[in-house]
Curated annotation (Swiss-Prot):
Key words of the record: DNA-binding, Homeobox, Nucleus, Phosphoprotein
Protein name: Iroquois-class homeodomain protein IRX-2
Main location: nucleus
Residues within the DNA-binding region(s): 112-175
Region (Disordered): 176-373, 424-471
C-alpha cells in the first residue's frame, strides 16, 4: 500500500506517536506494547477484516477504545489493512516493492491534474529537455508519446513540456539558428504554434518562402471568391437572385452593391426601366427571413410582361420583378421551389406552411398569380398544433385535404407578427364580411386593368370541388 498524497515520511518510532491519521485521541491513549511498532505483520499485507484474529478482536466490540493485547502479532492483525500500515513502514516484504516519491502515486506516477507537481521547471528538468532538443535539431517537434515520456521523466505536465519546446523553437528562430524546415501546425502542436509572429524574425530565405506560400494561399482564396462571385446559381440558403438577362455571368459583389445603393436613391423614378437588374441579396425590410425573400418574386410563368408597381406594404427590396426573357443560367432556388401543382391554386393562395411572420406579405399578394411557387411544403404531411392552427382538429395530412376536398382557407386576421394562422370555418367568412383588412394593397393585374377590391381577410380557396366545410 502506498502512502497518501502529501504524506511525509517519518521515523518508525515517531510514527506510532504522531502520524496515525486513522485513530482518535482515545485510541492513541490506549496502552500498547513496545513490540507493536516493530511487528512484521502489521504492514499493508496484514490480514483483511475477515481473518480469525480480526473477528476475535471484533467480538469484544468496537464501541470502546480498541483493546490491545501483549501479543504483537495478534494486536497488529486485529487492525484492518488501512489501519495497520502506519505502524510499520519498513518490513522486509515491502523494501523496494513500493517506492515513494513526492510527485505522484506509485500506481499512476504521471497525473496531469496532480497538485503535487511542481509549478516551475527546475534546472535538471530543463537539462533533460535541452538534451532531447540537441539530439533532434533537424526536427524539434516531439510527438505525443515523446512529450508524455519527457513529462514523466522531468516530473512536468504535458502542457509545460509543449510550452517549453514551443519557446525553445521560437528562441532558436530569433537567434537565426533554425536547422529545420518550418512545417504546418498539426493537432499535436495546437498550443505550440499559437503566436502570430511565426515568420517575423526568420532568416531572409525563410521569410521569402513564407511570402510565397502566403501569396499562393491568397491566390487560391481570390480564385474561390471569383468563382463564387461569377456563379449565377443560388447559394445554399437561396438568397441569390438571377442577374441581368443578357449577361451569362453575374457582376461582382461590389458593383452590384454600388448599383443597389443607387437603386435605393432613385427608386421612384427608375423603377420601371431597371427591371433587368436585380439586387444580389435582398435587404429585408419586413419580418420575412432571407429564405423567403426569393420566393416572393413571382416565378417566370406568372411574371407579368408589363411593369407593375411594387407595393409598399409587402416589398422586401426596391428591386423590380425578374426579367421577362429567361436567361441561360437560372436561379436554382426558383427551380427547386417551383412545382407542377401551382396552376391548381386560386388567386392569392399561399402554401399551408406559411409562418406567421410572412402573413403581412401574403395578405397583399397579387391577384394574377400565386406569390409563392408551390413549395415542397405542400408535398409532405403537415401537423399543426394548437398555437399555430387553432381550430383545425383533424391533425391529418393537409395535402390530402387540399387535393381531395378542394379546400384551403386562411384567416389573415392574425397578421400581427406575434400571432399565427387561425382558421375557424365560420369565423373566417364572418371576418371577411366585416370589413377590409388594413394591410391590403392594390395591384395591377396581368391584363392591365384593376380587378375589384378583394377583401384580404377573405379566405382563399383552391379552384376545384368548391368550398366545403372542414372535416
Amino acid at each position: 500500500m502506498s502512502y497518501p498524497q502529501g504524506y511525509l515520511y517519518q521515523a518508525p518510532g515517531s510514527l506510532a506517536l504522531y502520524s496515525c491519521p486513522a485513530y482518535g485521541a482515545s485510541a492513541l491513549a490506549a496502552p500498547r506494547s513496545e513490540e507493536l511498532a516493530r511487528s512484521a505483520s502489521g504492514s499493508a499485507f496484514s490480514p483483511y477484516p475477515g481473518s480469525a484474529a480480526f473477528t476475535a478482536q471484533a467480538a469484544t466490540g468496537f464501541g470502546s477504545p480498541l483493546q490491545y493485547s501483549a501479543d504483537a502479532a495478534a494486536a497488529a492483525a486485529g487492525f484492518p489493512s488501512y489501519m495497520g500500515a502506519p505502524y510499520d513502514a519498513h518490513t522486509t516484504g515491502m523494501t523496494g516493492a513500493i517506492s515513494y516519491h513526492p510527485y505522484g502515486s506509485a500506481a499512476y506516477p504521471y497525473q496531469l491534474n496532480d497538485p503535487a507537481y511542481r509549478k516551475n521547471a527546475t534546472r535538471d528538468a530543463t537539462a533533460t529537455l535541452k538534451a532531447w532538443l540537441n539530439e533532434h535539431r533537424k526536427n524539434p517537434y516531439p510527438t505525443k508519446g515523446e512529450k508524455i515520456m519527457l513529462a514523466i521523466i522531468t516530473k512536468m505536465t504535458l502542457t509545460q513540456v509543449s510550452t517549453w519546446f514551443a519557446n525553445a523553437r521560437r528562441r532558436l528562430k530569433k537567434e537565426n539558428k533554425m536547422t529545420w524546415a518550418p512545417r504546418n501546425k498539426s493537432e499535436d502542436e495546437d498550443e505550440d504554434e499559437g503566436d502570430a509572429t511565426r515568420s517575423k524574425d526568420e532568416s531572409p530565405d525563410k521569410a521569402q518562402e513564407g511570402t510565397e506560400t502566403s501569396a499562393e494561399d491568397e491566390g487560391i482564396s481570390l480564385h474561390v471568391d471569383s468563382l463564387t462571385d461569377h456563379s449565377c446559381s443560388a447559394e445554399s440558403d437561396g438568397e441569390k437572385l438571377p442577374c441581368r438577362a443578357g449577361d451569362p455571368l453575374c457582376e461582382s459583389g461590389s458593383e452590384c452593391k454600388d448599383k443597389y445603393d443607387d437603386l435605393e436613391d432613385d427608386e421612384d423614378d427608375d423603377e420601371e426601366g431597371e427591371r433587368g437588374l436585380a439586387p444580389p441579396k435582398p435587404v429585408t425590410s419586413s419580418p420575412l427571413t432571407g429564405l423567403e425573400a426569393p420566393l416572393l418574386s413571382p416565378p417566370p410563368e406568372a411574371a407579368p410582361r408589363g411593369g407593375r408597381k411594387t407595393p409598399q406594404g409587402s416589398r422586401t427590396s426596391p428591386g423590380a420583378p425578374p426579367p421577362a426573357s429567361k436567361p441561360k443560367l437560372w436561379s436554382l432556388a426558383e427551380i427547386a421551389t417551383s412545382d407542377l401543382k401551382q396552376p391548381s391554386l386560386g388567386p392569392g393562395c399561399g402554401p399551408p406552411g406559411l409562418p406567421a411572420a410572412a402573413a403581412p406579405a401574403s395578405t397583399g399578394a397579387p391577384p394574377g398569380g400565386s406569390p409563392y411557387p408551390a413549395s415542397p411544403l405542400l408535398g409532405r404531411p403537415l401537423y399543426y398544433t394548437s398555437p399555430f392552427y387553432g381550430n383545425y382538429t383533424n391533425y391529418g395530412n393537409l395535402n390530402a385535404a387540399l387535393q381531395g376536398q378542394g379546400l384551403l382557407r386562411y384567416n389573415s386576421a392574425a397578421a400581427a407578427p406575434g400571432e399565427a394562422l387561425h382558421t375557424a370555418p365560420k369565423a373566417a367568412s364572418d371576418a371577411g364580411k366585416a370589413g377590409a383588412h388594413p394591410l391590403e394593397s392594390h395591384y395591377r393585374s396581368p391584363g392591365g386593368g384593376y380587378e375589384p377590391k378583394k377583401d384580404a381577410s377573405e379566405g382563399c380557396t383552391v379552384v376545384g370541388g368548391g368550398v366545403q366545410p372542414y372535416l
